[in-house]
Amino acid sequence: MNDKLFEKLLNYYHIDMEGYKSITSPVDESNFALGHSFDHIEEAVALVKEVMSHNGKILIYGDYDADGVMGTSVLVKMFKYVSYPVEYYLPNRYEDGYGLTIKKAQEAIENDIELVITVDNGISAFEPIEILKSKGVKVLIIDHHQAQEILPLADFIIHPILSHFGEVPSSGAFTAFMFSLAFLKRFDKYLSTLAAISLVSDIMPLVSYNRNLLRMVIANYHDREFFQIDALKEDEPFNETTIGLKIAPKINAIGRLIDGDDINRLVAFFTEGDKSQLLSYISWINEVNESRKTASKSASDSLDHYSPDEPAIVHVTDAKEGLLGLIANQLVNKYQVPCIVLTKDKSGDLLKGSCRAPEGFNVVEAFQTLSKYLLAYGGHASAGGCTLDSKNFEIFKAEFIKLVKATPLQKVKKDQISIGITDINEDSYRIIQAFSPFGESWPAPLLSLKRVDTSSLFFSRDEKHILTQIGHSTRLTGFNFPRSEVQQHRFIDLTGHLRINTYRGFKNIEFLISEISSSDKS
């Protein structure tokens, strides 16, 4: 074992051996209480069972992103386990928008729904819930979003923070899963797997109970156990990387692209068992995902005329609103400048946009500064969304670029672990993986190789990428680092991560380069 690397990892994560044992000790079902840790969860279960006792109609109202899909599927499957039929609805991004609406509340009343359960939404649906309650409809909110000081007048609210379960934010599907524990009085492996997927897809902090659930699900996952998950991940191992790069994007693609109520087929996919029908669903999911890739690449390429002397990218595209964040993200990753991509709404009068920015630029603060040009905005430091009148586009663009010019990007210095070329091996990879799963609030360790001689590097045939074999099954890989730029320096420092890459049955341990900097001595 590479003791030096292990010690460096302990320092990197600011933990001692006790902390290491805590994050690596086995987790099992006993780590999860049967729901009683949430305030009022037993009363909420009793409410649901009281409605069931006289065959009352129940509607589960979810959301169009992966967390909303997983949360809705958890609850629908939970009811299937007890053979109780329920109705469910995932809103369409373009026709319904986010969350329970007044229109859908009125439809629920017309359809004699007795109980509405919102999942991954509801905490801000004041008026729709007031309408439901005024007509005697019971409401249970299962949500995780930040609440306002005043809460909706639901019968019960199950929420990780508000219900005093803990202090770490979690996902809607995790919260729904915890409700299923209290309802079923047992731990269900499939439902826990759906919840674990949502922790990664919704970028929840991978600490505390979030980490425990994800670790347990990954450790106990067996191929060919759950057809739906196997079909989504294909031949990849089930872990946080596969969830983030394979599974979640496919689920989210449906909500990004599909019009009408076809998105509800996703819940059927995750909760039904007919093999031929499931094969039809996965074919559809893969087809939509390929369309998502093609559409976002096409839109990104059409906007790809950035000049290095521009401090920001602000463009209007005809791409669907659900793709704007992906397109903006691609451009930010390529050019490392703030980027806003907008598209017209159906009326043509409004522009809806998505903003992404590199570290060091605060998106939501920029929107606050320019709020007089915006009809609505929201988000956080590195990502946000906005709506503006089309007539204000040119002045908004000019003012945003002006603001970026006046706000030089502050390079955020990240902790790194210095290693040598000989440390790029399977043993080092195994030591690092012991600290996984990696994600929000627990990133994969950033590694650095100092003073690499550029004359020792090999490049792809088109000389755009670093592809250097350094051992029988180890190599340096860096995409979009052209020879012409790299070899302007005699020595460079490399920053990146260790990963395992399997291609045509051959396994390589790669140092995947994310950044290079000159280490030539002046």
Model features per residue range: what roles?
Residues 2-115, 135-136, 153, 184-398, ...:
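Hydrophobic helix-and-loop "lid/oligomerization" segment in the mid-to-C-terminal part
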Residues 109, 118, 123-133, 137-204, ...:
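Conserved phosphate-handling catalytic cores of large alpha/beta enzymes
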Residues 127-132, 327-330, 431:
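A short acidic, amphipathic alpha-helical/loop segment
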Residues 315, 466-472, 511-514:
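Short, acidic/hydrophobic/Gly-rich beta-strand patch recurrent on exposed beta strands
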Residues 392-396, 488-522:
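OB-fold single-stranded nucleic acid-binding module
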Residues 406-412:
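Non-transmembrane, aqueous-exposed alpha-helical and coiled segments at domain scale
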Residues 417-470, 476:
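Accessory interdomain/linker segments of ATP-dependent helicases and helicase-like nucleic-acid enzymes
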Residues 471-486:
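Beta-strand/loop nucleic-acid-binding surfaces
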